[in-house]
Every structure is written in C-alpha cells, then in structure tokens.
C-alpha cells in the first residue's frame, strides 16, 4: 500500500514538473553553480554582464574544442612501443632445410621428357633463329605449347610492334608492313614474352620480360607445375631427395644427431624438406650456452649432379629458422646457403607483443580471421603467411575453378592442369598480378599478436680448404657409400653452423599511448584551467538540462490536451450543461400530458381540466461538484514535499 502511494506521488510529481519557468531555472543555475563565470553574469551591471557573458561563452567554447581534440586523439587508438632487454636460457629454434632442386632429375626425367625437348627447341630458336628454322618440329609434343607459347616481340618500330611465334613460319602482328627477317631480330630489338589466350582465342594478353632467361625460366616452371599437379603427393615424395641422402652429419651441442631427428614435410617449391626441433611430438631442445659449439652443425650433400637443369638454377640449400609448431614458409622467409662453403648463422631473438584490437589489427589464434586456414591439417599455429596463401587459393578456386599446385586444397577441390582446365594458366597469372585481389587478402588477414622473430647474422668461408679437401671427402664418401672411391666434391656439399650469438633477447611491446586515465586527466585539466570546474559542475549542468527538457515535455503535453479540449468544445454551440440540467432532462415524462397525441374521444369530455403534476424540484447538485484531482493532490503534495 505504501509503495503504491509512493509511486502515485511520484507520478503526480512528474506531471507537475520542477515548478519553475525557463528564466527562473536559468537564474537559479547561474546563482548556485560552482563553475566560475555564470554568477558574475547575473550579479554585475549591464556592461559587466555582457563582458562576463562573452568571456564565459569564449572559454566554454575553448573547453569544448579542447575536449574534442583529446577525444579524437583517444579514439585514434595510437600505440607506443617499448623495447626491453632480457637474459635467459632459450629454446633452440626450429630449423627447416630444403634442397634447391625439388626433385632428382634421374627420377623425373620420364615426366619431363616432352617438356625438356620443347625447352631445348625454344632455346635454339631464341639463340640461333636462322640455323634452327629448318629443324623439324613434327616429332615434338606441342600440346602444352599451344596453351601458353613463348613469342618474340619485334619492337624496332615502336609504333608497329610485331609478334613472332617461335614455331610459326608467318609472323602476326599489328604492323601493316612485313617485318624484317628473323635473323635480324637481335636481343636489343626483340623481347621474349609469354602469350596468354583464352580457350576460344578471343582474348590474348602478353606477359613481357626484360630478359629471355626470366621468360624461359618462368615458362618452364609453369609447365612443370602443370605436370606435377597430376602426380599424387606420395609419389612426388619418392622423386625427391631423402633425408638419409641429404644429411651426411649432424651435431647439436655435444650430442650427435642424425636424419632420424628431422621431421619430413613436402613443400611443392622445394620438394622434400626436413625440420629439426619442430616440437610437434617432443619437447623443444634448449640451448645450453651461446656460441658455435652449442648450436647445430650440419654437413649436407645436395647432389648437384642430379639437379633438374631447367627447374633449379640455384645450387645449395634453402633454410629457415622459425618457432616450434609453426609452418615454415621457406620460399618467402628462407635464406640460401651456397655449396662448397661453411655458412655460419648467428641468431638473435626478438619477441613481438602487439596490443590487439582496437589498437593493432592482430589476432591471437586466427579464429577471428574470415579466411579458411588450409594449413590446419599440419596442426601448426596461425601465421599471416598461412592466411595469405589460403586466401589466394580460395580466390584461385573461385576464379579458375581449380587450385594451384603450390598451396593446399580445400576438401572436394582439384589442382589445376591443362587437360581438365585449359584456361587455368591465363587465369592464374591474371590473378597473381591483380593488385585488387592482393589488397583484398591483405585486408582480411591479420598479424599474430605474439610473434618471435629470429635475426640472422650470416658469414661464409670456403669449405673444405684445399689442404683438407682430400681426406674430408674420402671420409664422407666412405660413411655415405661404404666405398673407398671419392663420390663427393666441393660443388655438392654444404656445411652449416647455426647458434645463438648471445642469450640476450629483445622484447618489443606495444602499449596504449592514450588510455582512459590520460583522457580523464586532460578533460578535467582543461575544464578546471579555463572555467574552474569539476565533475560536480558537469552534474549540475546535466541537472539543469534535464529540468529544461522536463519543463518542455510538460508544456507540450499541456498544449496537446488544450488542443483536444478545444476540439471537443467546438461540437456544442453553448456552454456545457450543469448537473441539475442533466438531471431535469432525465425526468420521467410519464406524468406529463400528451399534448401532441390526443385521443379521438377527447371532444367527448370538453370540460375536463388538466390537473397539475405533483412533484418536488431536484436539488442543486452543482453545489456538490467534486474538485479536480490535481487540486486535491497539490494540497497534499505540499505537505509531502
């Protein structure tokens, strides 16, 4: 009951409002606020009132402008970077090594036979066009040539370039005049390009190169990709270099190791790659001390005599240092070690800690990245390279209806090949050169919030020396082939030393440059400096704003009620009837004579007199009219307040 009465009083209080006019409320605020300035506006003379009004308005505007600047700075989510140094024993990084040649030529020769013959003919046409013009091409398989041929572009006349097909007798071009003889087209006047045409030949584009070496290398790699994409991966593994053949000697610190301590993965660019200390099934190995003697030492046999001649133009190994349980993107982040040398790699560790949203667009584990991670089957941690490759493969499948051989496939998709997807090569090259598609993937992918980078200092020296070359190769050949004959040479071996330069590591950490404490401090400082205000002054200002809105709502409600009442009164001509008139209007008319409807027998009684109707006039009920509810409540409200 008390709660109901209290709520009813609150409702009446809301209906009545503050009880002030706008002017009275404003004067009350200026007289009672703790903010400097408004009191002088109402207490001084006319001139000083105007002066203090302008000063107060100026400083209030200045405070609002400063507040806007600080809030905008805070919402820009700027970060500050701190660098700290630490010293502790650290886990040795994972080391991935790959041979520069993905396959052994002796095992893939049958797959590349047609391509190699075509490549030799192409080189002959480019290097000696006159002597090779008469060579027959009927014996060669030109099916792969028809999809993406190499052409010569004669640019001696810049306004009328001529396109010359290497295996066609008649040149085709944009010039109306006949071009000069093929022999006259030298390296300065002609450029080798790759012609990319759709299946029906309606649209063609040319991929130009500044050197014929670049042109034939990329063309051969594109055709080799088309061939290897049709071979199952388990067979491709057998075509590459085995760990037992590649790794001749291994030593980690003072403990010997072997190829059995490496985990094998297949990387399409480099074939079989091997990871040391990956940490997938075993605990990461720690490094006892910095220095060469406490690192990883490897002697590798790259087997350069069995390289694919047109596919691998670099002799050596490709290696990469990375975190445990992370996938090695060795093509993008690896370094090369040259054969016939001892390569020493000193390692420094940088740990990156990004702040995260909204300060830095990073992700903890990739769960908030809208790209399917195609490397999830390897059970590795998230990386931006995995996201970029997965994004490109998704775009490749959407645009070309097939996936590229270099990247993992989503379930239910197929790798591209010219037999099933004749248009895949032009589609792939157009997608790879599309800046819009690259920007799309960059926007969708995020950096990892916590990352470890290994900075390498690389030095090289000839190995072995001429004085020790004979006995070292004898020992290594004996250990590998159990033969007294020397089967190794300087051009086929690589020695690696990987070690920590020092146990000092750097931590690069992001922190918020402007936090909420900074924002409140600056907002309060500006308000207090220019107007002598505080948080309570803001509450006072909010109170008067609420009262202004309250009064405005009450006035609008009263105005709406008045309009409805005037509309209702307009229906009647006179004033509204009183209670007595309403009661008299409902008097029983049964005792009144029926003057309008006289009986036909009325003339039979001419002397009949109309008798008076007895009755008592009704009381004056206007004197008992109740007062309006708001009048009664206003009296009681005064007592309550």
Swiss-Prot record:
Glycan attachment points: 141, 261, 379
Tell me yes or no: is Cell membrane among this UniProt entry's keywords: yes
Annotated motif PY motif: location in the chain? 617-621
Give residues where Phosphoserine occurs: 634, 636
Activity regulation comment:
Originally identified and characterized by its inhibition by the diuretic drug amiloride.
* Region (Disordered) residue spans: 596-641
Describe the reaction catalysed, as an equation.
Na(+)(in) = Na(+)(out)
What is a single Pfam family found in this protein's UniProt entry? ASC
TM segment ranges: 51-71, 534-554
Source domain of life = Eukaryota
Residue numbers on the Extracellular membrane side? 72-533
- Write the record's keywords in alphabetical order, separated by commas: Cell membrane, Cytoplasmic vesicle, Disulfide bond, Glycoprotein, Ion channel, Ion transport, Membrane, Phosphoprotein, Sodium, Sodium channel, Sodium transport, Transmembrane, Transmembrane helix, Transport, Ubl conjugation
Compositional bias (Acidic residues): 632-641
Q: How is this protein situated with respect to the membrane?
A: Multi-pass membrane protein
Q: Where in the cell is it found?
A: Apical cell membrane; Cytoplasmic vesicle membrane
Record bears the keyword Membrane: yes
User: Which pairs of Cys residues are joined through disulfide bonds in the record?
Assistant: 98-273, 185-190, 197-204, 250-257, 362-449, 387-445, 391-441, 400-427, 402-416
Under InterPro entries, the record lists: ENaC (IPR001873), ENaC_chordates (IPR004724), ENaC_CS (IPR020903)
GO MF terms held by the record: ligand-gated sodium channel activity
UniProt family annotation:
Belongs to the amiloride-sensitive sodium channel (TC 1.A.6) family. SCNN1B subfamily.
Q: What does this protein do?
A: This is one of the three pore-forming subunits of the heterotrimeric epithelial sodium channel (ENaC), a critical regulator of sodium balance and fluid homeostasis. ENaC operates in epithelial tissues, where it mediates the electrodiffusion of sodium ions from extracellular fluid through the apical membrane of cells, with water following osmotically. It plays a key role in maintaining sodium homeostasis through electrogenic sodium reabsorption in the kidneys. Additionally, ENaC is essential for airway surface liquid homeostasis, which is crucial for proper mucus clearance.
- Its protein name is Epithelial sodium channel subunit beta
């Amino acid at each position: 009951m008390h709660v109901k009465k209290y709520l009813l009083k609150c409702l009446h209080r809301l209906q009545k409002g503050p009880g002030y006019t706008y002017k009275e409320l404003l004067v009350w605020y200026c007289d009672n606020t703790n903010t400097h300035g408004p009191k002088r506006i109402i207490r001084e003379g006319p001139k000083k009132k105007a002066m203090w009004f302008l000063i107060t308005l100026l400083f209030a505007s200045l405070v609002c402008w400063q507040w806007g600047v600080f809030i905008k700075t805070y919402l820009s989510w700027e970060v500050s970077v701190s660098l700290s140094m630490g010293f502790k024993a650290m886990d040795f990084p994972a080391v991935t090594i790959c041979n520069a040649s993905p396959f052994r030529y002796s095992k893939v020769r049958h797959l590349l036979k047609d391509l190699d013959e075509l490549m030799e003919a192409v080189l002959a046409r480019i290097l000696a066009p006159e002597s090779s013009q008469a060579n027959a091409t009927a014996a060669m398989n030109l099916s792969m040539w028809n999809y993406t041929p190499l052409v010569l572009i004669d640019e001696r006349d810049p306004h009328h370039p001529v396109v010359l097909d290497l295996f066609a007798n008649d040149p085709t071009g944009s010039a109306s005049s006949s071009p000069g003889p093929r022999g006259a087209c030298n390296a300065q006047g002609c450029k080798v390009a790759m012609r990319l045409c759709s299946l029906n030949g309606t649209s063609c584009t040319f991929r130009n190169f500044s050197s014929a070496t670049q042109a034939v290398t990329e063309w051969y790699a594109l055709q080799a990709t088309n061939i290897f994409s049709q071979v199952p991966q388990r067979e491709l593994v057998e075509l590459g270099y085995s760990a037992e053949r590649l790794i001749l000697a291994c030593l980690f610190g003072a403990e010997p190791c072997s190829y059995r301590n490496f985990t094998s993965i297949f990387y399409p660019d480099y074939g079989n790659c091997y990871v040391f200390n990956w940490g997938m099934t075993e605990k990461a190995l720690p490094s006892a001390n910095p220095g060469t003697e406490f690192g990883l030492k490897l002697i590798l046999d790259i087997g350069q005599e069995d390289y694919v001649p047109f596919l691998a133009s670099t002799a050596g190994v490709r290696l990469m240092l990375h975190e445990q349980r992370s996938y090695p993107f060795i093509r993008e982040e690896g370094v090369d070690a040259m054969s016939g040398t001892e390569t020493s790699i000193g390692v420094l560790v940088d740990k990156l800690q990004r702040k995260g949203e909204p300060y830095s667009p990073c992700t903890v584990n990739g769960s908030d990245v809208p790209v399917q991670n195609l490397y999830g089957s390897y059970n590795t941690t998230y990386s931006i390279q995995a996201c970029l490759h997965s994004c490109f493969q998704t775009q490749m499948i959407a645009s070309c209806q097939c996936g590229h051989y270099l990247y993992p496939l989503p379930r239910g998709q197929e790798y591209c090949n010219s037999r099933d997807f004749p248009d895949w090569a032009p589609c792939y090259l157009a997608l790879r050169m599309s800046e819009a598609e690259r920007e799309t993937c960059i926007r969708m992918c995020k950096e990892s919030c916590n990352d470890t980078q290994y900075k390498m200092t690389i030095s090289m020296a000839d190995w072995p020396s001429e004085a020790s070359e004979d006995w070292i190769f004898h020992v290594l050949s004996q250990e590998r082939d159990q033969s007294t004959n020397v089967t190794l040479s300087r051009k086929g071996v690589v020695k690696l030393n990987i070690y920590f330069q020092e146990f000092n590591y750097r931590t690069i950490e992001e922190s918020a440059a402007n936090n909420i404490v900074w924002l409140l401090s600056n907002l309060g400082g500006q308000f207090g400096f220019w107007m002598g205000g505080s948080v309570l002054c803001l509450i006072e200002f909010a109170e008067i704003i609420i009262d202004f809105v309250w009064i405005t709502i009450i006035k609008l409600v009263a105005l709406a009620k008045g309009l409805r009442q005037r509309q209702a009164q307009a229906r009647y001509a006179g004033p509204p009837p009183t209670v007595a008139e309403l009661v008299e209007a409902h008097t029983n008319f049964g005792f009144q004579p029926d003057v309008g409807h006289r009986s036909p027998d009325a003339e039979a009684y001419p002397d009949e007199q109309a008798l008076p109707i007895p009755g008592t006039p009704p009381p004056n009920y206007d004197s008992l009219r109740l007062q309006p509810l708001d009048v009664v409540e206003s009296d009681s409200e005064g007592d309550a307040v």
